[in-house]
């Protein structure tokens, strides 16, 4: 596979990447009251946060503010809060999944120990509300509305994580496509799309119509983002996945691909056996992917993600938005299902 060509959205992310990184660093620099607190808490959390992905979540929050007539900078505390949430959630998620690699590096619980990693994740989650509360540029009523969005996001994400982990723990293979969509919407779509956009639009002074349209756009694109993540874990490359390749099979994840394939009686028992085995054998992992291809499940998931992209674009079609921001949102929807890492 080849890398997709540069798009307006990827150019936007690259343009503002250093800006949001520099702002995020301010939440860790000089915060510790002793060298040991720095060593055991702020340094590892700062390093984890700095080892960034593309920063699309905070940057689309800031973009949403401009889309409804506000300023880009006005939403940066909410943007940072969402990135703090992701740091905490990912640190804890890696512990729950016994993960090995995150963003090309060993997971924090492997380098710092489980106890300190949990504590770092706890601090990151606490910083979600603190970051917004401490922003002197936001009016109190706006802070309350944004905090409502953020707390709802946290609850929904934790609910989705409960389903994801619970199905594996209980050996559940009776999961339907609708079950998967509910889980992935909760676990990923709120914090990867809906909440960043809604919070940014609130800060930017958007109307109820604008806020809800951007929320709907974010739910659709956020779900498409998760489905593409599932696909990349299976059929991407080990290098593009930062060595975290086909781990969804090893961990027995009920992805959309797996759930669809399980509905094929010809392969149900074999898929169930592989997903239940915890195997890291490359031959077994390749066999699972072969089955997913034979059942048409990979194509099914890709088509579903494309359909979500179309629904997302329709959600903002008739809503008044800044033209440049609209162009970036449409490009974002395409990027979420075209990216290769």
What feature does the model see in each segment?
Residues 269-319:
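Mobile late-domain/C-terminal helix-loop "cap" segments
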Residues 7, 144, 215, 303, ...:
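Short, charged, amphipathic alpha-helical segments
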Residues 35-269, 334:
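Mg2+-dependent prenyl diphosphate-binding active-site environment of isoprenoid biosynthetic enzymes
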Residues 308, 321-341:
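Short, amphipathic C-terminal "tail helix"
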Residues 1-32:
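N-terminal amphipathic/basic leader segments beginning at the initiator methionine
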Residues 258, 312, 329:
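Hydrophobic, well-ordered secondary-structure elements that form the walls
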Residues 15, 19, 23-26, 149, ...:
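Charged, amphipathic alpha-helical oligomerization/scaffolding segments
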């Amino acid at each position: 596979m080849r890398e997709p060509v540069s798009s307006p959205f990827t150019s936007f992310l690259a343009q503002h990447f250093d800006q949001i990184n520099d702002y995020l660093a301010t939440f860790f620099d000089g915060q510790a009251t002793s060298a040991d607190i720095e060593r055991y808490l702020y340094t590892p959390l700062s390093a984890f946060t700095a080892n960034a992905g593309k920063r699309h979540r905070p940057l689309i929050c800031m973009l949403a503010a401009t889309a409804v007539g506000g300023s880009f900078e006005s939403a940066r505390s909410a943007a940072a809060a969402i990135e703090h949430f992701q740091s905490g959630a990912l640190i804890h998620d890696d512990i729950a999944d016994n993960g090995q690699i995150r963003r090309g590096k060993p997971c924090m619980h492997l380098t710092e120990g489980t106890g300190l990693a949990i504590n770092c994740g706890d601090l990151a989650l606490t910083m979600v509300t603190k970051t917004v509360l401490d922003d002197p540029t936001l009016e109190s009523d706006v802070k309350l509305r944004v905090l409502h969005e953020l707390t709802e996001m946290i609850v929904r994400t934790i609910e989705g994580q409960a389903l994801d982990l619970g199905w594996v723990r209980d050996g559940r293979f009776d999961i339907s496509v609708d079950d998967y969509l509910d889980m992935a919407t909760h676990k990923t779509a709120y914090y990867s799309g809906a909440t960043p956009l809604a919070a940014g639009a609130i800060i930017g002074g958007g109307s109820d119509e604008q806020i809800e349209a951007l929320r709907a756009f974010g739910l659709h694109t956020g779900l498409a983002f998760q489905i593409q993540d599932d696909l990349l874990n299976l059929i991407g490359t080990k290098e593009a996945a930062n060595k975290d390749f086909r781990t969804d099979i090893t961990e027995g994840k009920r992805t959309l691909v797996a759930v669809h394939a399980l509905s094929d009686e010809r392969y149900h028992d074999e898929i169930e056996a592989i997903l239940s085995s915890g195997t890291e054998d490359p031959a077994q992992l390749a066999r699972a992917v072969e089955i997913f291809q034979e059942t048409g499940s990979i194509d099914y998931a890709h088509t579903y993600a494309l359909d979500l992209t179309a629904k997302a674009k329709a959600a903002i079609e008739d809503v008044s938005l800044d033209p440049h921001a609209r162009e970036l949102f449409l490009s974002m929807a395409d990027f979420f299902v075209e990216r290769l890492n």
